[in-house]
A protein has these predicted regions:
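N-terminal alpha-helical targeting/anchoring segments
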Residues: 1-98
Length: 101
Protein backbone atom coordinates (compact mmCIF):
# COMPACT_ATOMS: atom_id res chain seq x y z
CA UNK A 1 0.00 0.00 0.00
CA UNK A 2 1.65 3.25 -1.11
CA UNK A 3 1.97 6.33 1.05
CA UNK A 4 3.29 7.23 4.44
CA UNK A 5 2.69 4.31 6.84
CA UNK A 6 2.34 6.60 9.87
CA UNK A 7 -0.25 8.68 8.03
CA UNK A 8 -2.12 5.50 7.07
CA UNK A 9 -2.14 4.40 10.73
CA UNK A 10 -3.46 7.83 11.80
CA UNK A 11 -6.16 7.67 9.12
CA UNK A 12 -7.17 4.15 10.09
CA UNK A 13 -7.44 5.11 13.75
CA UNK A 14 -9.22 8.32 12.79
CA UNK A 15 -11.73 6.41 10.68
CA UNK A 16 -12.40 4.00 13.55
CA UNK A 17 -12.81 6.91 15.96
CA UNK A 18 -14.69 9.22 13.62
CA UNK A 19 -12.20 12.07 13.95
CA UNK A 20 -8.96 13.32 12.43
CA UNK A 21 -5.92 12.14 14.37
CA UNK A 22 -2.32 13.30 14.21
CA UNK A 23 0.34 10.97 15.56
CA UNK A 24 3.63 12.21 16.95
CA UNK A 25 6.78 10.50 18.16
CA UNK A 26 7.00 10.97 21.94
CA UNK A 27 10.31 12.29 23.28
CA UNK A 28 10.33 9.50 25.89
CA UNK A 29 10.21 5.96 24.39
CA UNK A 30 8.38 4.81 27.53
CA UNK A 31 5.38 6.73 26.16
CA UNK A 32 5.06 4.47 23.13
CA UNK A 33 6.07 4.50 19.49
CA UNK A 34 3.46 7.15 18.71
CA UNK A 35 1.19 9.37 20.77
CA UNK A 36 -1.68 11.77 20.27
CA UNK A 37 -3.44 14.40 22.32
CA UNK A 38 -6.60 14.28 20.19
CA UNK A 39 -8.79 13.44 23.19
CA UNK A 40 -7.59 16.55 25.02
CA UNK A 41 -8.17 18.73 21.95
CA UNK A 42 -11.60 17.39 21.01
CA UNK A 43 -13.18 16.61 24.40
CA UNK A 44 -15.10 19.92 24.52
CA UNK A 45 -16.62 19.24 21.08
CA UNK A 46 -17.65 15.74 22.17
CA UNK A 47 -18.82 17.02 25.56
CA UNK A 48 -16.95 14.25 27.31
CA UNK A 49 -14.01 14.13 29.72
CA UNK A 50 -10.70 13.79 27.82
CA UNK A 51 -9.66 10.69 29.77
CA UNK A 52 -12.95 8.94 28.94
CA UNK A 53 -12.59 9.82 25.25
CA UNK A 54 -8.95 8.65 25.26
CA UNK A 55 -10.02 5.33 26.82
CA UNK A 56 -12.52 4.80 24.01
CA UNK A 57 -9.86 5.63 21.43
CA UNK A 58 -7.46 3.20 23.14
CA UNK A 59 -10.02 0.41 22.74
CA UNK A 60 -10.47 1.23 19.07
CA UNK A 61 -6.71 1.49 18.54
CA UNK A 62 -6.07 -1.86 20.22
CA UNK A 63 -8.46 -3.47 17.72
CA UNK A 64 -6.27 -2.38 14.79
CA UNK A 65 -3.85 -5.06 13.61
CA UNK A 66 -0.99 -2.54 13.45
CA UNK A 67 -1.29 -1.66 17.14
CA UNK A 68 0.31 -3.94 19.70
CA UNK A 69 -0.73 -1.88 22.72
CA UNK A 70 -2.65 1.32 23.42
CA UNK A 71 -2.92 3.08 26.75
CA UNK A 72 -4.22 6.29 28.23
CA UNK A 73 -1.75 8.50 30.07
CA UNK A 74 -2.23 11.55 32.22
CA UNK A 75 -5.32 13.66 31.63
CA UNK A 76 -6.11 12.12 28.23
CA UNK A 77 -3.06 11.37 26.10
CA UNK A 78 -3.15 8.21 24.01
CA UNK A 79 0.11 6.26 23.69
CA UNK A 80 0.48 3.60 21.00
CA UNK A 81 2.97 0.80 20.47
CA UNK A 82 3.00 -0.67 16.97
CA UNK A 83 3.58 -4.31 16.13
CA UNK A 84 6.98 -5.49 14.92
CA UNK A 85 5.32 -6.54 11.64
CA UNK A 86 3.99 -3.01 11.07
CA UNK A 87 7.37 -1.53 11.90
CA UNK A 88 9.10 -3.91 9.46
CA UNK A 89 6.63 -2.95 6.73
CA UNK A 90 7.12 0.75 7.44
CA UNK A 91 10.90 0.38 7.33
CA UNK A 92 10.61 -1.56 4.09
CA UNK A 93 8.87 1.41 2.49
CA UNK A 94 11.72 3.81 3.15
CA UNK A 95 13.34 4.76 -0.11
CA UNK A 96 17.10 4.65 0.18
CA UNK A 97 18.02 5.48 -3.37
CA UNK A 98 20.60 3.38 -5.14
CA UNK A 99 22.21 1.90 -2.04
CA UNK A 100 22.62 -1.86 -2.01
CA UNK A 101 21.41 -2.88 1.41
Amino acid sequence: MPGNPVQRLAEELGAAAGMQIELERPSDPAHGDYATNVALRTAPQHRRPPKELAAELAERAAALEEVERAEVAGPGFLNLWVTPAWLAEALGEIEIGRAHV
